[in-house]
Amino acid sequence: MFSLRPHQQRAFAVMQEHNVGQIVVPTGGGKTFIMIADAYKHLRDNGPQTIVVVAPRILLANQLCEEFLEQLHSKRNHIMHVHSGETKHFSTTKSDKIALFNNTARACDENCIIFTTYHSLGRVVDSGINIDTIYFDEAHNGCGRAHFAGVYAMSKIANRKFYFTATPRIGRGSSAFRGMNNAEVWGNVICNVPAPELIEQGAIVSPKILPFDANDGGVEFARTKHNMPEVDAYNLMQIVEGLDSDHDAKILVAAPNTRVLWAMLTQTDVMQQLKDKGYDIMHITSKHGAYINKTKVGREKFFQTLTEWGLDDDRKFVIFHYSILSEGINVPGLTHTILLRNLPIVEMAQTIGRVIRVHKDDRDAINKGALIPTQFEFFRKPHGYVTVPVCGKAGNAITTRLQRVVDAIFKEGVPPLSFV
């Protein structure tokens, strides 16, 4: 079993004292390992258990499953997925089959671990099974009108329920009941880890904002809804040109929307330009699916390749997405993110969180005592770089807003709040 960092141990300990509560940990702080440690203890100490893990997306549900099973590999743990995606494990969205699978495992005095999404959580509720513990990953997603009914029902069904997030959402007015400030549903905040603590521990690196002046070497005409793909492709290549050629970059590009993303890839030569510079290209959207270079692949293959390439220091790639990779997805090795759109505060914080994970060599050196966590000048990856194209007063306002969010989270230790 792995060892926990101090902030993870603190969260784990407080979970043993409460049956409900919110755990607020910045992106990159290892929330999943806190869940796994808690699950391991209760599976070991309390006999047969039914545990549910909820994620906002199928891709993340599959990733969480793999991370759980790396540690919880007993033959007594029976795994079920409740969503419409691909998985090698038993999967269903039919409530009667959910009940049959769970009750069979429990009748054999064994455990059932269910991985589901907020979208499919109602199917688990409708199955009528008893649930010992439920972990809500990226719990702020449960505040949405479409998802709250399942979250509310689970707050009455599960014996233990814990809500993990880096970006709490607050309710007010007509949405007050759904907000995470409603302790009747979400419990109170039982652990709040400030981001500066994680930076001091060497658990994450700080983000660095690098504005790109689109008027200085960029395009000479205004960006409109008609020319977005061409302008964004041009600016992207200008940004890539300016990267440090001594280090292989792994770049996450947040596109304005699926239409612009697809047009960039199919109606401009950006893919060929990136290929000529030695980059592999990956992209994923709900509408078009997952692609590696120009080959369409399943999501499991996509995620497996993403992990392998992320860990390969000799591989450089650009991954395009609209929103599917913003929350929770662990992509090791990402060095840069390029924001081609003005993101809402939660999505902005989540996207930045994708590139502030510590490089594996730096993490190993810290664990061996060969590297002091705060001496970033000696890190192989001293920062996670965030670039946004700016043009004129509006662009400057975007940069200022982005810097304000970064300072609040990573210098002042204030988690980004948004409203339902």
Where do the PLM segments sit?
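Walker A/P-loop
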Residues: H18-D38
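Conserved helix-turn-beta segment of the N-terminal RecA-like "Helicase ATP-binding" lobe
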Residues: L59-S95
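Post-DEXD/H (motif II) to motif III coupling segment of the RecA-like Helicase ATP-binding lobe
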Residues: N141-I204
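Conserved interdomain linker/interface between the two RecA-like ATPase lobes of SF2 helicase motors
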Residues: G187-R259
